[in-house]
Amino acid sequence: MLSKNVHTADVVIVGAGPVGLFAVFQAGMLEMKCHVVDALDCIGGQCVTLYPDKPIYDIPAYPVITAAKLIEQLKQQVAPFDTVYHLGQQVIGCKIDNDIITITTSAEQVICSKSLIIAAGCGAFKYKRLILDNIEAFENKTVFYSVKDKNKFINKKVVIAGGGDSAIDWTLLLSDVAEVIYLVHRRENFRCAPHSLNQIKQLAEYGKVQMIVPYQLAKLTGENGLLQEVLVTNFNGGTQTLPADYLLAFFGLAADLGPIHKWGLKTDLRRIEVNSITYETTIPGIYAIGDVASYPGKLKLILTGFAEAATAMSHCYQRVFGKKMHFQYSTVKGVLRS
């Protein structure tokens, strides 16, 4: 009889973000016993912890859907299946013996399976913080690195710093509620979708957004953590002082695969190299999908991750049961094994 902290599964999924959840759905459709491990204490990954209100535009059949709503829909999709979740736990150990993959979590849970899928996004993540004098006095009061409630910014003066998709997307989203938005970027060129940048330029013509380029943050002023002004400078020594109630800084994430680095997988710039057909890593039986997976021609889209999840799970099925699955359309509830 197994100890209560020792479990068996057909497949273990590391990561409970959108791609991990869709992998859970695929496992359920194949009637595979599935366990999920995630370091966060809730389901949803970055979608719920970093940008729940952020609009997503590239999910088929949804012209626009917020990150939080997408997770809610995925949770409903996997609800019929008896999935076991180990939340608030990190995978700290992995060993393979006779084709059995055994992982150990930080909560001393042991899970044995024949297949494992890593859907860990960018891994453990930390925001790239601002390096400014006295920044700690303002952080989590009037300086933030993510947005969880856009209503906080109603009729407020907001400075948004950054030149990527996150900065642009939040400028567009908050332009409907903020009094004014100052978009600060150190370069004149932005790293974002051209359509989104064109929308920003239209808002600038109407005065809802002021594009402060090429400038970078230099100094914050205020009292008791309440921001009053943001000083910005350019490379020619020019300065501007921006009145501000809030500052949002979107300079990306510092990602870390954590203990996964020690598994012996081949990695490339904090991502895991996989076979582009099966999404299997350099260790048989271990697969990687979503943003954490790397292969030639990779597109870092949620949609791509969904397709990778379906393919990887089909190969997990073959490994677990020793035969190819009998594919049926997803209109059939619970795909037969063959």
UniProtKB/Swiss-Prot annotation:
Binds 1 FAD per subunit. Pfam families: Pyr_redox_2. InterPro entries: FAD/NAD-bd_sf, FAD/NAD-binding_dom, Fd--NADP_Rdtase_type_2, Ferredoxin-NADP_redctase_2. It comes from the Bacteria. FAD binds at D38, Q46, Y51, V91, F125, D291, T331. Its EC number is 1.18.1.2. One of its GO terms (molecular function) is ferredoxin-NADP+ reductase activity. Keywords: FAD, Flavoprotein, NADP, Oxidoreductase. SUPFAM superfamilies: FAD/NAD(P)-binding domain. Its cofactor is FAD. It catalyses: 2 reduced [2Fe-2S]-[ferredoxin] + NADP(+) + H(+) = 2 oxidized [2Fe-2S]-[ferredoxin] + NADPH. The keyword Flavoprotein applies. Homodimer. PANTHER family: THIOREDOXIN REDUCTASE 1-RELATED-RELATED. Belongs to the ferredoxin--NADP reductase type 2 family. This is Ferredoxin--NADP reductase. It comes from Orientia tsutsugamushi (strain Boryong).
